[in-house]
Amino acid sequence: MKLSILEAAALTAASVASAQDDLAYSPPYYPSPWADGHGEWSNAYKRAVDIVSQMTLTEKVNLTTGTGWELERCVGQTGSVPRLGIPSLCLQDSPLGIRMSDYNSAFPAGINVAATWDKTLAYQRGKAMGEEFSDKGIDVQLGPAAGPLGRSPDGGRNWEGFSPDPALTGVLFAETIKGIQDAGVIATAKHYILNEQEHFRQVGEAQGYGFNITETVSSNVDDKTMHELYLWPFADAVRAGVGAVMCSYNQINNSYGCQNSLTLNKLLKAELGFQGFVMSDWSAHHSGVGAALAGLDMSMPGDISFDSGTSFYGTNLTVGVLNGTIPQWRVDDMAVRIMAAYYKVGRDRLWTPPNFSSWTRDEYGFAHFFPSEGAYERVNEFVNVQRDHAQVIRRIGADSVVLLKNDGALPLTGQEKTVGILGEDAGSNPKGANGCSDRGCDKGTLAMAWGSGTANFPYLVTPEQAIQNEVLKGRGNVFAVTDNYDTQQIAAVASQSTVSLVFVNADAGEGYLNVDGNMGDRKNLTLWQNGEEVIKTVTEHCNNTVVVIHSVGPVLIDEWYAHPNVTGILWAGLPGQESGNAIADVLYGRVNPGGKTPFTWGKTRASYGDYLLTEPNNGNGAPQDNFNEGVFIDYRRFDKYNETPIYEFGHGLSYTTFELSGLQVQLINGSSYVPTTGQTSAAQTFGKVEDASSYLYPEGLKRISKFIYPWLNSTDLKASTGDPDYGEPNFEYIPEGATDGSPQPRLPASGGPGGNPGLYEDLFQVSVTITNTGKVAGDEVPQLYVSLGGPNEPKRVLRKFERLHLAPGQQKVWTTTLNRRDLANWDVVAQDWKITPYAKTIFVGTSSRKLPLAGRLPRVQ
């Protein structure tokens, strides 16, 4: 196979070198587990087996391999099996809407969903996105994201995910997945795993920025931290039935994420019981044999480098089976996993071809964009897929607003004599809402950050527009200055304003775009575009200054948040197309703010720990990013080091007040945990593998330049691969057990979707009474934290929450449960979850540091 023999040797050599050089090491785990169709996957699995059994080898390979960058209409597209009616599958970004399209919605970012703490809204957003993807003819949505989790507050893509807390992320991750897949589209849980920064994620990208590295960054983590922090939300995703997982660019303990047998074979497929397929991130595929045996099921976009016409899969995967390097059962399993996901979401009933092109807005163009080949046809049908989704977008935008501070300034009455709207972030991008490719600039109001995780706006309501409409209703005066450097005019407007509304922001994004020296990751946590000076100027001239922050995460506010003239602070995140309307709803009291901050607001950057690697530290080899902090990120770190935050995790004010009382705890299940034992079934093969002559290019096929095909040029396998080293001894480099299809031992922590079913048995029922003691209706989020009791554990960790709506004077009893996973730690020796003998205490309140109710749990096992 082309490059694969060399790559297998390199992998072995790298493992030895890693051990010798005392670098982090990822132990091998083989063979790659085969799907068995357990639980809710049963019917889809049976259908997948039936159809795959009818496929030839090259038809199976066609499902596993993208056709190449810009070769079809979508950012990723597989081959098809027309003989059996199986279409080419369209894969398209992003986690917040359809990228590179038109007449689609631009949804709030994942971080805003986290700020709502609302499971229903997470599901509704997922369902609405799924409907739009389906209506555009997209089969696989490349989202949602739980990687990055948010280890470092300045990580460039944190906003695509939810929160640095794994429990909050896991719940909302799962609800989003359910919504997408209930709309008939395969969801993709990404980026798996430890993809926590943009610096050094790709060699070419880093070299373009002047860094002389030859391998991508290695995220080095211990087993306990992996399970208790970063793997946690992916377990929730698997339990929710996610159809696809995208492996990441980075290395994990010096093994690439898309050929790391421990993370793919052991953790994801064996331990968590994942039944869907693993796809590579775009060009994160580094080998043929190595990746296939380590658990990679689909290569995206198919070519080794964009538009190269070469692939680690395609023809080379066909050759790998024919020469015995890759067992037939492994390719059969790849195809079964892909088709099972397809059937599970009902895509076969809803499938339509893509009605748009990612590469042009022209109505007509060549069928194959990059080589300008194939039929000249209608490539864009301009189908409007927005439906009524503006309603849920606006609601999430408003419900995600976090009222950080309110000294009586809010809500506004609408009768203010003069309202000043100050700051570039209130206005429009002079180039238009979509004027910067993939939103790669910070111009005008910030409603989404930058990168492949974006969508085109159908429109963007700015704060200036929405607030002006409000002021004019009350026949007041409204003056706006959206030039952050026009200090004189800002001061003039502020001095005559009854209330000054200051809009500031901080942006970030994906590493292929450099915005103002920010290579994806933020250079610092300060406000952008002179934001601090705008606030300073306004507070010097107006004693009623309300600051609205649109940002990708925390920013430093210590110099001004306590200023007596700052009477209100709101964090509005990245609210999408209805941005202005959403913030106006909150400012004018139509919506009572109920958002809670999904991250901690520290006094300094140092408060968070130095967790972003910005300079190579391993010569020109892979930069080594050591996760020495373990599970202590965000509020867990603040608690450990007794750091006092400005606003703690989970904080958020309301226009009303609430009281929590009456904590009750009941043991509902005292059964003991039973580790999984026994063996899997043997790997199955479906259909026969013929000799090489059966897999030659079909006669009369007109080949498309650079298109990735599964067929052979010749029955001479070496000639078909073009690999000059083909035929050299390579079985000594195949990892031990990698081709073994016999029954395998089951892992103790395995046994069902998301792991051992015993982990999800409810042990305790907890109830609390919440009372609205104020004069207006509002939402409160009771939060349950657990102290696991060990000397090296966080003081407390979030485990349960619920957003509740209460009328004035109304009481509600919130009842939740705690399962075994909620109370357990990962035992690195037993390789299983264990409830330790340390005392377990629960705390219930309205933030991580406002916890008025507490109770000790009886001991369970």
Swiss-Prot record:
GO terms for biological process: cellulose catabolic process. It is an enzyme of class 3 (hydrolase). It holds the Pfam family Glyco_hydro_3. Its main location: secreted. The active site is at residue 281. Glycans are attached at residues 62, 212, 253, 316, 323, 355, 524, 543, 565, 669, 713. Pathway: Glycan metabolism; cellulose degradation. It catalyses: Hydrolysis of terminal, non-reducing beta-D-glucosyl residues with release of beta-D-glucose. Keywords: Carbohydrate metabolism, Cellulose degradation, Glycoprotein, Glycosidase, Hydrolase, Polysaccharide degradation, Secreted, Signal. Residues 735-754 are annotated as: Disordered. One of its GO terms (cellular component) is extracellular region. PANTHER family: BETA-GLUCOSIDASE (PTHR42715), BETA-GLUCOSIDASE A-RELATED (PTHR42715:SF29). Belongs to the glycosyl hydrolase 3 family. Beta-glucosidases are one of a number of cellulolytic enzymes involved in the degradation of cellulosic biomass. Catalyzes the last step releasing glucose from the inhibitory cellobiose. This is Probable beta-glucosidase A. It comes from Aspergillus terreus. The lineage of its organism: Eukaryota, Fungi, Dikarya, Ascomycota, Pezizomycotina.
